[in-house]
From Swiss-Prot:
Chain spans, region Interaction with LRRFIP1 and LRRFIP2: 1-427
Cellular compartment(s): Nucleus; Cytoplasm, Cytoskeleton; Cytoplasm, Cytoskeleton, Microtubule organizing center, Centrosome; Cell junction, Focal adhesion
Protein name: Protein flightless-1 homolog
GO BP: any one term: sarcomere organization
Region annotation Disordered: where it falls in the sequence: 951-977
Top-level division of the source organism's lineage: Eukaryota
Gene: Flii
Phylogenetic placement of the source organism: Eukaryota, Metazoa, Chordata, Craniata, Vertebrata
Function description: Is a regulator of actin polymerization, required for proper myofibril organization and regulation of the length of sarcomeric thin filaments. It also plays a role in the assembly of cardiomyocyte cell adhesion complexes. Regulates cytoskeletal rearrangements involved in cytokinesis and cell migration, by inhibiting Rac1-dependent paxillin phosphorylation. May play a role as coactivator in transcriptional activation by hormone-activated nuclear receptors (NR) and acts in cooperation with NCOA2 and CARM1. Involved in estrogen hormone signaling.
Organism in which the protein naturally occurs: Mus musculus (Mouse)
Subunit structure: Interacts with actin, ACTL6A and NCOA2. Interacts with CARM1. Interacts with LRRFIP1, LRRFIP2 and MYD88. Upon LPS stimulation, LRRFIP2 competes for MYD88-binding; LRRFIP1 constitutively blocks the interaction with MyD88, even in the absence of LPS. Interacts with the nuclear receptors ESR1 and THRB. Interacts with SGK3. Interacts (via the gelsolin-like region) with TMOD1 and TMOD3. Interacts with LMOD2, VCL, GSN and DES.
GO molecular function: actin filament binding
Expression across tissues: Expressed in blastocyst.
Disruption phenotype: FLII knockout results in lethality during early embryogenesis at a stage preceding gastrulation. FLII heart-specific knockdown results in cardiac hypertrophy, reduced ventricular function, increased lung weight and lethality in early adulthood. Mutant hearts have shorter sarcomeres and thin filaments.
């Protein structure tokens, strides 16, 4: 790479994370002759590269986390070297050269986490040393001469070594600010040197065997010491010397043996963090309440109880974190909940019984951890806090009002919810009402006075002649009313408020602020607005506004610069004129603004108007990998890159191929197809053609792009393949230099807004890392992206584009690597895929409609809050307040059944056998199997309606008709009588275990035949098991029997079978369904049929009709009828009453006698509701009384009321929003039933799909396993 590029202007670069093993260190680093700092962390270096010798201006070198065994090389030849960071290597004493300590400017040395056994020789010669880190080595002694010379040290870290003593010369370190000695066996070190270190700010002595006897008696002279760590020692009480520290802000005394605290802790008036975890504390002194600046208090793993916490702890008004886990707390003081800034409250592993109700008023709380407190009962939320949820008022009174209840009902519900009257509360309400009445009167008086004053001023203005003071006529422009426009989108609030120069550049019709470093540099094809702010003779702010026109500028830029210059004048309220300046013809006043130092640069931004250009697409091929979120890895454009285990995406611009290998997963194929759809939609404007290819079925055009079809497609990608970690660089541009630091995206400070906690540990790229004012280079090994922020300076963009090309050429990269440019807002889909949860969707508050958002803008205070209250989300809970549907009387059901059967002219049945429907035998009518599909063709008579004679017929016509002969009139009447009409309905019945092939077979075969036989008279009704049409059920006259399995397979089995006869809401909805053969399912209010088969040829078995003692007599008679019609004479039949069961066959056949229910009271109260958002808003609807297990929708919430409990059933695909809203609806329903049925209070229970209890399942007829998705 020639030195004519941008490399000589690079002042700093971070190449960490690249792989430089095996001699891959870039030679072009030598061209960075102006390099000041260089980071080579985690690059696999085993020795220092020779190219460092050319960097004569290098000041900072970082080679941490490598495999270096020596620092010998060219370091001593770098005269400007100031800092050497070589932590986490394999350095020994022999690998540290002596001559580096002769460098005059060496001030920072970090050799921590190495294998040193003693201090490096000649270290004392580095007299300008400021920072020295030798921690995590094996050093056992410090030479006395070291601290005689290194007296200017500011930071010293000797932690995790083997030091047993410290040299007395340490008292010479009077400038030392940070001293870290953690993890050294300093038992006999008295630390008498500490009082002499007057500038000390941080002192860490963790795990150094500190006791009361080996600490200084006083540290009063250390007035700057603010951070002390004495954790993991043997202290039995707080050392007295700590009470003398006036500036202490952070104190860590954790993991000691401290049993009590002194009252002297109130001397730490500036303390912000106090850690007393893992001690023996039983109580805290009341003096701790005086630490008003305390923000973090850690008391984990002590012996504190409720009495051990002072009642005045609420005085800690700055407290943000309180952690007291693993103690003996039964309660916490209520005053703790009065700390207004409390964000984190950790109380797990205690003995908590409850918490103060004030816990709900902690507005800043973010973490509340009360786990492993088995006896804890959370306090109820205040009523006013539970009223609204997702902007919906769930109070019982409001929902009754919305449901159309009478005012008396609403008032009664309010009385039920209010409970007993509180005379004290009534007194306070009256007092507040009185005060508010006075406030209203005062507001009315003030409003009246202000209206009078405004009217008076208006009259005075109208009466005054249009003359200025002194009798002079006002200028015409002073009488003009300036339009009230909002310029905040273009100019910030601080514009023109401080003396100085501010410049904007016109880009896409709007002004963009130019950084101060680029003032005086104008692009020939651009236009600028220049604002000079200064103080006039009177000390007031004044302004000069210019708009500069480039010689090559387009018309849109010229017009916008003039317009926005006037907008700026109006925004500032300035009276000056806007002055036009043209390139090459600037005025003297304009040149003086820049001290006659302006320069012109060729180029400029594109015009704001659209231009039509032919887009050039680069052909790329990507390998798709990943499981949950797919990632794309570019591969060479050749057939040998294909691997049968992966999916590949070939992007040819307007042709996109998705190639699926023979061993690739269907999931990745689908995700790759969706990815291609996004590319087509967002980048190709929907013009691209997407083709899905399967290995072995590729068209010739596909292989032409890849240079021909390979002889064999092999598995060549390693099983443990994972691409290198992406590296994100931020391009920095200063006066004559470039910098390229890496973004450590594991640190939250690098993000524009703090990301979610779960995304931080994984080193993931997040969109919040990108700042619109900056330019970034994303190095993904085989892809290099240059991301340009919308508000980034143009010079930085140009430098980044050039630097990205040179960086790609300098580092070892594959040949198919491409450098691409991405502008903010128009990023390619491949670029977005590198980031975690890239979000293109605008943040929208779905709890408010569009009109409410528009109306709410600009409102503030009480007006805004009132507006939000009126714009609540729609929610329909009316079904919860309707009475339960009463059961249909038996006489009415039989009458309806008779009418429907009178209209039935004929009924033919068909059953699916194999792949075709065959006629159902007559003896099997009424018998259905759960794995079969049935079709019933029903022909109904349609009543004939005779037309009445028209009343307007004239009398002459009547007379002539009467005059006809009798036979002719009779024949004519017979001809006019219409024929009786009919209608055909085809009922398709599908068992809950049957596949959808039956419906498809019926649709394409039998239905076509029926439509040809009965054109225009055919209606098809599709039904599933236990969700049948009542009219269809009526044709079987209550003898509707459902067996498990398939017809011919099940009929020959010798296993006992049990059937339950049950009526749901109406005699029309009576079914006899096979259930599990288990005596615990019996119920005294129902009738059951038990079939016990025999192996004998003469007698196939015995069948019992079991009649419960509390069953309905009509159902008992029906059970006997079903018994006789369901089984032929080959079975012995017997009707038995409850309590008369024979032991031999009945209890043996049913599987032994077990306890069972003796009543079915729940049948009189059972109701099923569905809670869903499918209508676009939250609504609750009630299922009919004839519901079944399949009515439980997996993506919704179901509410089941059995008269004692209200079960909230949660499906596996239910959203969190529906769960929260349904919980509120449950609470409203329970409140309503409490007001209607005092004698039957309901309890709320949660049921998840697959974990239903017996009390829940018995409400459903023939409960079984859940139905799988039909094939």
């Amino acid at each position: 790479m020639e030195a004519t590029g941008v490399l000589p202007f690079v002042r700093g670069v971070d190449l960490s994370g690249n792989d430089f093993k095996g001699g891959y260190f870039p030679e072009n680093v030598k061209a960075m002759t102006s390099l000041r700092w260089l980071k080579l962390n985690r690059t696999g270096l085993c020795y220092l590269p020779e190219e460092l010798a050319a960097l004569q201006k290098l000041e900072h070198l970082s080679v941490s986390h490598n495999h270096l065994t020596t620092l010998h090389g060219e370091l001593s030849s770098l005269p400007s070297l100031r800092a050497i960071v070589a932590r986490a290597n394999s350095l020994k004493n022999s690998g540290v050269p002596d001559d580096i300590f002769k460098l005059d400017d060496l001030s920072v040395l970090d050799l921590s986490h190495n294998q040193l056994t003693e201090c490096p020789r000649e270290l004392e010669n580095a007299k300008n040393m400021l920072v020295l880190n030798l921690s995590h080595n094996g050093i056992d002694s410090i030479p006395n001469q070291l601290f005689i010379n290194l007296t200017d040290l500011l930071y010293l870290d000797l932690s995790e070594n083997r030091l047993e003593s410290l040299p007395p010369q340490m008292r010479r370190l009077v400038h030392l600010q940070t001293l870290v000695l953690n993890g050294n066996p300093l038992l006999h070190a008295q630390l008498r040197q500490l009082p002499a270190m007057m500038a000390l700010q941080t002192l860490h002595l963790r795990n150094t065997q500190r006791t009361q006897s080996n600490l200084p008696t006083s540290l009063e002279g250390l007035s700057n010491l603010s951070d002390v760590d004495l954790s993991c020692n043997d202290l039995t009480r707080v050392p007295e010397c700590l009470y003398t520290l006036p500036s202490l802000r952070r104190l860590n005394l954790s993991s000691n043996q401290i049993a009590e605290l002194s009252l002297c802790i109130d001397q730490w008036v500036h303390l912000e963090t106090l850690n007393l975890s893992r001690n023996q504390l039983t109580s805290l002194p009341s003096a701790i309440c005086k630490l008003t600046k305390l923000k973090k208090l850690y008391l984990n793993s002590n012996k504190l109880d409720f009495d051990g916490l002072p009642s005045g702890i609420g005085k800690l008004t700055s407290l943000e974190e309180f952690m007291a886990a693993n103690n003996n707390l039964e309660l916490i003081p209520e005053s703790l909940c009065r700390c207004p800034k409390l964000k984190k409250l950790v109380l797990n592993k205690n003995r908590l019984v409850t918490l103060p109700e004030a816990i709900h008023f902690l507005t800043e709380i973010q973490v509340l951890d009360v786990r492993e407190n088995p006896s804890l009962v959370m306090p109820p939320k205040p009523a006013d806090r539970t009223a609204e949820w997702y902007n919906i008022d769930f109070s019982l009174q409001n929902q009754l009002r919305l449901a159309g209840a009478s005012p008396a009902t609403v008032a009664a519900a309010a009385a039920v919810g209010s409970g007993s009257k509180d005379p004290l509360a009534r007194k306070m309400r009256l007092r507040r009402r009185k005060d508010s009445a006075q406030d209203v009167q005062a507001k009315q008086v003030l409003k009246g006075m202000s209206d009078v004053a405004q009217e008076k001023n208006k009259n005075q203005e109208e009466s005054i002649d249009a003359r200025a003071p002194g009798g002079k006529v006002r200028r015409w422009d002073q009488g003009l009313e300036k339009p009230r426009l909002d310029y905040s989108e273009f100019f910030t609030e601080d514009v023109g408020q401080l003396p100085g120069l501010t410049i904007w550049q016109i880009e896409n019709f709007v002004p963009v602020l130019v950084e101060e470093a680029f003032h005086g540099k104008f692009y020939e094809a651009d236009c600028y607005i220049v604002l000079k702010t200064f103080l006039d003779d009177s000390g007031s702010l004044n302004w000069e506004i210019y708009y500069w026109i480039g010689g090559e500028a387009t018309l849109d830029k010229k017009a916008c610069s003039a317009i926005h210059a006037v907008n700026l004048r109006n925004y500032l309220g300035a009276e000056c004129r806007t002055v036009r300046e043209e390139m090459g013809d600037e005025s003297e006043e304009f040149l003086q603004v820049f001290d006659n130092d302006i320069s012109y640069i060729e180029g400029g931004t594109a015009s704001g108007f659209y231009t039509v250009e032919d887009t050039h697409y680069v052909t790329r091929m990507y390998r798709v990998y990943g499981k949950k979120n797919i990632k794309l890895e570019p591969v060479p454009l050749k057939g040998s890159s294909l691997d049968p285990r992966f999916v590949f995406l070939l992007d040819q611009g307007l042709d996109i191929y998705v190639w699926r290998g023979a061993q690739a997963t269907l999931s990745n194929t689908t995700k790759a197809r969706l990815f291609a759809e996004k590319i087509n939609k967002n980048e190709r404007k929907g013009k691209a053609e997407i083709t899905l290819l399967v290995q072995g079925q590729e068209p010739p055009g596909f292989w032409d792009v890849l240079g021909g079809e390979p002889s064999e497609i092999k598995n060549h990608v390693p099983d443990d393949f994972w691409p290198p970690q992406p590296k994100l660089y931020k391009v920095g541009l200063g006066l004559g230099y470039l910098e390229l630091p890496q973004i450590n995206y594991k640190l939250s400070v690098e993000h524009k807004k703090r990301p979610k906690v779960e995304l931080m540990p994984g080193m993931r790229l997040l969109q919040s890392l990108l700042d619109t004012r900056c330019v970034y280079i994303l190095d993904c090994w085989s892809d290099v992206f240059i991301w340009l922020g919308r508000k980034s300076p143009r010079l930085v963009r140009a430098a980044a584009l050039k630097l990205g090309q040179e960086l790609c050429g300098m580092l070892h990269r594959p040949r198919h690597t491409v450098v691409s440019r991405s502008l903010e807002g128009t990023e390619a889909q491949v670029f977005k895929a590198k980031f975690k949860n890239w979000d293109d969707v605008l943040t929208v508050d779905y709890t408010r409609n569009a009109e409410a958002v528009l109306q709410g803008q600009g409102l503030s205070g009480k007006v805004k809050r009132d507006t939000e209250k009126t714009d609540q989300m729609k929610a329909d809970l009316t079904a919860l307040f309707l009475p339960r549907q009463p059961p249909m009387p038996l006489a009415e059901a039989e009458q309806l059944m008779e009418e429907w059967n009178e209209d039935l002219d004929g009924m033919e049945g068909f059953v699916l056998e194999g792949r075709k429907f065959t006629r159902l035998p007559e003896e099997e009518f009424g018998h259905f199997y759960t794995q079969d599909c049935y079709v019933f063709l029903c022909r109904y008579w349609v009543p004939v309606e005779y037309e009445e004679e028209e009343k307007t017929e004239d009398k002459e016509g009547k007379a002539s008709a009467e005059a006809r002969e009798g036979e002719e009139a009779a024949a004519e009447a017979e001809e006019k009588q219409p024929e009786e009409d009919f209608q055909c309905i085809v009922y398709f019945w599908q068992g809950r275990e049957a596949s959808n092939m039956g419906w498809l077979t019926f649709t394409f075969s039998l239905q076509k035949k029926f439509e040809s036989l009965f054109p225009g008279k055919l209606e098809v009704v599709r039904m599933t098991q236990q969700q049948e049409n009542p009219k269809f059920l009526s044709h079987f006259k209550r003898k509707f029997i459902i067996h498990r399995g398939k017809r011919k397979v099940t009929q020959g089995t010798l296993q006992p079978t049990l059937y339950q006869i049950r009526t749901n809401g109406s005699a029309l909805c009576t079914r006899c369904i096979q259930i599990n053969t288990d005596s615990s399912l019996l119920n005294s209010e129902f009738c059951f049929i038990l079939k016990v088969p025999f192996e004998s040829e003469d007698n196939q078995g015995i069948v019992y009709a079991w009649v419960g003692r509390a069953s309905d007599p009509d159902e008992a008679k029906l059970a006997e009828d079903i018994l006789n019609t369901m089984f032929d004479a080959s079975y012995s039949k017997q009707v038995i009453n409850e309590g008369e069961e024979p032991e031999n066959f009945f209890w043996v056949g049913i599987g032994a006698q077990k306890p069972y229910d003796d009543d079915a009271e729940y049948m009189k109260h059972t109701r099923l509701f569905r809670c869903s958002n499918e209508k676009g808003y939250f609504a609750v609807t009630e299922k009919c009384s004839d519901f079944c297990q399949d009515d439980l929708a997996d993506d919704d919430i179901m509410l089941l009321d059995n008269g004692q409990e209200v079960y909230m059933w949660v499906g596996t695909q239910t959203s969190q929003v529906e769960i929260k809203l349904s919980l509120k609806a449950c609470q409203v329903y329970i409140q309503h039933t409490r007001s209607k049925e005092h004698e039957r209070p309901r309890r709320l229970r949660l049921v998840r799909k697959g974990n239903e209890q017996r009390a829940f399942t018995r409400c459903f007829h023939a409960w079984s396993t859940f139905r799988q998705a039909p094939a």
